[in-house]
Amino acid sequence: MASTLPPLGGGNGGPHTQHSLPSLPAHLQSDTHITGHLASRFHVSHPTAKLSSHALVCLNTYTSSSKGPDGGKPGSAMAGAEDMADRAWIRLGHRSENQAVVFLGESGSGKSTIRSHLLTALLDKSSTPLSNKLSLAAYVFDSLTTTKTATTPTASKSGLFYELQYDTSATTNPILIGGKLLDHRLERSRIADVPTGERNFHVLYYLLAGTSQAEKTHLGLDDGASGSRRWKYLGHPTQLKVGINDSEGFQLFKTALKKLEFPRSDIAEICQILAAILHIGQLEFESTNNTSATGDDSGGFSHEGGQTSTTVRNKDVLGIIAAFLGVSMADLQSTLGYKTKMIQKERVTVMLDPAGARAHANELARTLYSLLVAWILESVNQRICAPEEDIANTISIVDFPGFAQQTATGSTLDQLLNNAATEAIYNFTLYNFFDRKAEMLESEEVSVAPTSYFDNSDAVKGLLKPGNGLLSILDDQTRRNKTDMQFLESLRKRFEGKNPAIEVGSATAKLPGSNFYTENAAASFTVRHFAGEVEYPVKGLIEENGEVVSVDLLNMFNSTKSEFVGRLFGQDVLQTVNHPIEKSTVMQATISSKPMRAPSVMSRKGGRGRGIASQRRQQESNLFDSGNTHAESRSPKGGNKGGIDQGASGQFLSSLDNVQKAVTDPGTNAYFVFCLKPNDRRIANQFDSKCVRTQVQTFGIAEISQRLRSADFSLFLPFGEFLGMADAETILVGSERERAEMVIEEKRWPSNEVQIGSTGVFLSERCWMEIAGLVDGSAAQGRFALPSSDGYGNDGATPGERDAFGASKEQLLSGGNTPLMYGEKGKPGYFGSDDARSEAGASAIGGGDMFKNFDTREQMAERGNEKNLEEIEEFKDSPSRKRWVFTVYFLTWFIPDFLIRWIGRMPRKDVRMAWREKLAINMLIWFMCLVAAFFIVVFPMLICPKQNVFSAAELSSHNGKDGNSAYVSIRGHVIDLGSFADRHYPSFVSRKTMLNYAGMDVSSLFPVQVSALCQGTDGSVDQTVTLDYKNTNMTGSPALINSQDLNAQYHDFRYFTNDTRPDWYLEQLIMLKGNYGKGTIGYSPEYIAKLGAKRQVIASIGSRVYDLTTYTVGGRRLRTKPGESLPSDPKLADFMDRKVVELFQNQAGGDITKFWNSLALAPDVKARMQTCLDHLFYVGDVDTRNSTRCKFAEYLVLAVSILLVSVIAFKFFAALQFGGKNVPENLDKFVMCQIPAYTEDEDSLRRAIDSAARMRYDDKRKLLVIICDGMIIGQGNDRPTPRIVLDILGVSETVDPEPLSFESLGEGLKQHNMGKVYSGLYEVQGHIVPFLVIVKVGKPSEVARPGNRGKRDSQMILMRFLNRVHYNLAMSPLELEMYHQIRNIIGVNPTFYEFMLQIDADTVVAPDSATRMVSAFLDDTRLIAVCGETALTNAKSSFITMIQVYEYYISHNLSKAFESLFGSVTCLPGCFSMYRIRAAETGKPLFVSREVVDSYATIRVDTLHMKNLLHLGEDRYLTTLLLKYHSKYKTKYLFSAHAWTIAPDSWKVFLSQRRRWINSTVHNLIELIPMAQLCGFCCFSMRFVVFIDLLSTVVQPVTIAYIVYLIVLVATKTTVVPITAFILLGAIYGLQAIIFILRRKWEMVGWMILYVMAVPVFSFGLPLYAFWHMDDFNWGTTRVVAGEKGKKVVISDEGKFDPSSIPRKKWEEYQAELWETQTSRDDSRSEISGISYGTKAQAVVSEYGFPSRPDSTTGFAAHALPYDSRNNSRMSLAHSDMGHHRMSQFGGSQFFNPDDMVGLPSDDALLAEIRDILKTADLMTVTKKGIKQELERRFDVPLDAKRAYINSGK
């Protein structure tokens, strides 16, 4: 029948000219020979071959893909792609079939390049503006999803299904009407994890390289010189310069978006998001202590300085990101610092460490990029996609990333899904060649010789089978929250021994050196893919498959101020699950791994008759879920109940199924392109036979070629159609079949290309084209030229456009230098040359700055920081507040508000007001400090100014011997001889000679010329007058040297000498006083009087002393030069006025100032006399240092010291409380022990809980109440704190009570909180203690730190509960459940509890502490609260803790003991204090009284004072309230009760803790001082204590200044007084030492030394730091603004709280309802509906029931349950018979339901059996446990419920 025509593509030029592989002879059809044939073609520049008409085999030449053997296009890969496009086009037009082109090949084989050539060729067929857009859309897709890898510069990292949509109904020339881009599974992991030597997605590099300088500045990309900043998300800096023209790429990217009709603003927003992603990579995190106090602070002593939190180090980068994303910096930082997860239906917040925060930031970057890509592609599709009903046919291009032997980015999931897709595509390829026509051939009775081939069905079924394939199992296990190991076990069950392609590894392994199996950390499964075996580790696979987007991020972006970011997060691609009750609350979200649209091939199955819009919507949704068992909600807000329906694998599977269905659709004709790499090293023109042979083998090209040799059928034509085409009307005889046979005989086609069936003819494509008259591509192109209309009503495309796309086939962008896979430049197929020319230069938009009309970054940031606020309450300021505000403004008026706003960066008015208040308080404190300093230092100096005088004894002590300085006096002036000696001229007088005069009066060495120094009575004195200088030579006067001293002659320049220099003396004296003066000689008033009595003419005027003795007793003489005669007038020597001389003589020895002032002398005479006195008779100054005034000043300093020490002495005596530590007898009072827990670790919590449980106090009368503040996983913990607590207490994870509402302390809606209640018995070291655990879980809408409201709120839960119990008020659901648990489960009426012990979760209490405290309460009924001594457990962990040890010791044993004397300890530490709940005699509530509870529950904390009270020192404030409202009661310190806590060990936390303490001290003491009733006898009262405390706190810095001042005094003066002061200060520590010596605390000696070294820190540094940081708070979002008529309005972004949203009932009403319900129902165990706040009811009494019971606690209340719970008169376990019976033995370890007793043996039967057992048992070895086990064996039932009876031995 068939002849032997020349085969397809034959030729005569040697073997390499044969381009069709099936046409090779049979002996050349092996892998090796085909590889050889490809090699021979490759070497002559023929890089392609064909598999008949079905497939193209392309070898990557790594040079140009458009050059053939002759340098032209023919023979090139490009020509091959165009040929395929021509044939697809012809079939599309002539047969109206859908066409699909499927690409296969490894990464680096050139798929993307061939794909672009093919797309270009197809779009060239209809050169319209739309084809331009479709080309640009492909470029945008590639920019976003391709990257450079180790194997290729353009590796696609997302599966592409690109659909070109045509209308073929009107003509054989199809009209292009649209396109659709479907991306499958972008490799998101690459964003934050760029493999070494590879790049991230190209668009990120484009952005960095292509933006102008102005744009870079706006985007924050311009740091430093170019290239100096290393971008974490861009890999190694070398990747920025790898020969890809990124700058040009960016211009093209923008151009493409612009031509795709993206608004300019959207393009700019896209760039901002990309920049934000780059910046997210730059964030650096550090672990810090958040020292700003907030209302929801929680935790114990060690946390008080601030919670450990993770913050961003580079805030500038954070600011840029926050601005672009439209959120506030604070929100962004805190959101990155924690992560909310779902753990077993519980929402838990994990406090992240820096590494965790970095991972969270990476997740943000991945989420943003994924959403951005999804949004851009969906926007592109909206612009290019035609309505489904208009589409007649499509051409689809399918190109998925190549097979991956190992993962580059570390994502196993990406690798698995990628390989599953290549497996599916390869399977379809095999199906197409081997099985697709098999059924039809069979039905047409055509037999074809079978061909063997490698079938990958096992792998495909194993991976992709819906329901129980590997991906489906992975999805199912993810949905059911299974672990990786459970997933592995599921795979084992499914595949072991059932599927040869999948091998499951072991879940356990033996570690080296161990004999035991442990969990295998490297557990994996292996899949035998068609391209090789791949081992996939399971670790982290389930979590990765969940791909859950952090709810925290969603929550943050809900309030974004950026409209664009809002659009990104509002897409359908982001699938959310909403809370079943609170619909607005998102519980979980994922980004879909499948495209948001489906292939049109499938969409059209719905029919064409309906309306366009509705039909399309219906089709989209039907299709979207095609192959998907769970219908997926596409509404972003809608969501479903049970969690996300599909994980990544399920979604990918579903989308892959859509692709397969589209390609295998009967109406679709598929072509294949096999891309091969000639070598692995990317070397041009090198052919590695081994490398190529492996690929030929992998893809089964030889088998396919053999198959085509026997059956190359592409079409089936019924006889009629075939004959019509063949123009066979001329053949008139025979049936249709016979006529067809005749035509075929005539055509002489080979038998493998044509076969006749029973109803028609099977043809190859070549034969069809021949018979249809479409012999080659050129004919096709020539024959089917475009018609005049382009289908859009235009007159066809302009010639220019058509030419452009004609030109665009090869090298489009002459300026480009982007190497593609084939080593060519440019972007093939995307841009016309016109586009390139017009817009490749400067930035396409906005003349170099696309952000020209945008908000600046600062404006964006400001917008992001704004909150949406609403009014929540109104109030008026109190008069005292108004007075204080006036004072503040009075003190700070000089600082204008705008300065605080701009320089202090405080936009909020309330924050600025707090700053003013802080400044005012600091000014007052500084003023008090200055007053104190003035009083200590300046005041004494004002009373007794400092005198530089030397007594005779002091002068003589400066004699230059024994290291003393050498001073001399000259006429009353003291000169430093030691300093002057070396400068004495002439130099022949030795220093030693000079120092002989030290300590003496050397006035005699300096004779004076009287006429030069005194002008006498009448204005002149005769030159011959001389005056001797004589000392009195008494013990009080300086020792005068002899006037005959030999050295005197050298200084004698008087008139009668040869060398007369009248002014020499005065000049020398001025020089010596100026340079070497030390002071003057001092004469005390007593000594002057003594001299006067001894006939000395000496007196003082003012402070100066004058001695006229020598003048009066003849010391005046007249002396002339030799040869001159003496003047005759003897009165020449009387140069002083007589009245002056007489005054001195008459008043000698006294102060004559008054007389001098009233002396009757002419003013000029008096002035001359004063000069004479000063120069000739002055001998020194009056020494007042021992006067009463100066003594007072000295002793004032001493008095202050004595005052300080007296207070300490008081404290010392207070501390000397000896007396034996008598251990009190057993007490029968009921005590609650409250432990608030926050983020402590398990060790701390266990220590605290165990120490409380092990206290030596009747276990039945203790109740541990542990309150967990929020569902939070602390740093370093592996579980949330509540779970740690419940695990310690032995509560099973299966116990899950209902969360119940209660009121909390919070802003706005945060006042509504929810909590869970657990109770049971805790067994530890022989103690069995009842416990109640309250877990604050928050409302479902709380995303961040759910339930967390702070330590004060935790205290309030119990305080408010007890308050409502004692006042019989209506309670919230949580409180009713607490009441029920305490009363009906634990069996004690809550009113019985008298005392509450509060300890912190990091505190350990001594075993006898509760007993000692309770006995103190019993001894003194006026005692309301008591605290014990707290020491440190971590004393030696750092220097910071070491300096605190002694301070803790003395603060308790001195300060608190001192305050305790007055019955007013002003600070009871929350870490270890006990309170009296109600008065012993009257039952009146004390600790939980209405006033205390209401004041402590203040929610509006908006002033500096309130914040310091309630946010800094809530413990101290609680004490303040007790003293304020119960002033007749006392608070005491009990030194015999001990606890140990953890102190801050880092400087920052220590600083913060002390800041809190100091400031809260100041503010609390200010609260206490105004209380009138606090004054007592002689002020020895509480107010005295408070005032002393406040004063000492405020002036602490001055005390240090005082000590420093004393040290300086001692150093400068050796007088006795400062030394006395030091002795006193030493006594302070001496007294302290006595205390610890008497207490035998010898180790305190060392700690004391450390403490003394740190005193400057404690007393000076810390207070000053604290006072200035008084306003360092986290101010929250609630703020106060001025309202009308003096009112203030509180506004908040938390929303307004409605108290009625929490239902409240009294216990009696609730119990009556409960009782009614229980009595009206059947005996069967039915559930109560309608009134239960709590868990399901199971027991007769308990409406809340036992699911909330742990499984390992005693039968504490087992027998009490049937008891009428209304009979509350005998509920005390101590005195009720029932209680006694129940408590007689703490056997048993469970709570039992009476219904559990059904089917158990009776007590009598048990007793009989026990007796029987004991008859034969060895009584020495028998145990209760053994007897119980034997009974269980005999009765064959578990007897846990009867354990108490068995153990009782009755």
Curated annotation (Swiss-Prot):
GO MF, one annotated term: cytoskeletal motor activity
Record keywords, A-Z: Actin-binding, ATP-binding, Cell membrane, Glycoprotein, Glycosyltransferase, Membrane, Motor protein, Myosin, Nucleotide-binding, Transferase, Transmembrane, Transmembrane helix, Virulence
Glycan attachment positions: N245, N290, N427, N481, N558, N1033, N1058, N1186, N1453, N1559, N1767
Membrane topology: Multi-pass membrane protein
Regions crossing the membrane: 884-904, 923-943, 1196-1216, 1568-1588, 1590-1610, 1617-1637, 1644-1664
Entry-linked CDD domains: MYSc_Myo17
Domain (Cytochrome b5 heme-binding) ranges: 947-1006
Actin-binding as annotated region, ranges: 656-680
Primary location group: membrane
EC number: 2.4.1.16
EC main group: transferase
GO CC aspect terms: cell septum; cell tip; myosin complex; plasma membrane
The reaction(s) this protein catalyses: [(1->4)-N-acetyl-beta-D-glucosaminyl](n) + UDP-N-acetyl-alpha-D-glucosamine = [(1->4)-N-acetyl-beta-D-glucosaminyl](n+1) + UDP + H(+)
UniProt-annotated binding residues for ATP: G105, E106, S107, G108, S109, G110, K111, S112
Tissue expression pattern: Expressed in conidia and during appressorium formation.
Cellular location(s): Cell membrane; Cell septum; Cell tip
Region entry Disordered, spans: 1-27, 289-309, 593-647
Biased composition (Polar residues): 620-630
Disruption phenotype: Results in cell wall fragility, shows high sensitivity to Congo red and calcofluor white and leads to increased germination. Impairs appressorium formation, affects growth of in insecta produced hyphal bodies, and alters the surface properties of conidia and hyphal bodies, resulting in defects in the ability of the mutant strains to evade insect immune responses.
Chain ranges of the Myosin motor domain: 1-779
Family indicated by similarity: In the N-terminal section; belongs to the TRAFAC class myosin-kinesin ATPase superfamily. Myosin family.
Role this protein plays: Polymerizes chitin, a structural polymer of the cell wall and septum, by transferring the sugar moiety of UDP-GlcNAc to the non-reducing end of the growing chitin polymer. Contributes to the production of conidia and the ability of fungal conidia to germinate. Involved in the fungal cell wall integrity and the ability of conidia to withstand biophysical pressure. Required for appressorium formation and evasion of insect cellular and/or humoral defenses, promoting the fungal dimorphic transition to the production of hyphal bodies that occurs within hosts, and ultimately to virulence.
UniProt comment concerning the protein's domains: The N-terminal myosin motor-like domain (MMD) does not seem to have motor activity but is indispensable for polarized cell wall synthesis via binding to actin that ensures the proper localization to the hyphal tips and septation sites near actin structures.
Listed name of the protein: Chitin synthase V
Organism lineage: Eukaryota, Fungi, Dikarya, Ascomycota, Pezizomycotina
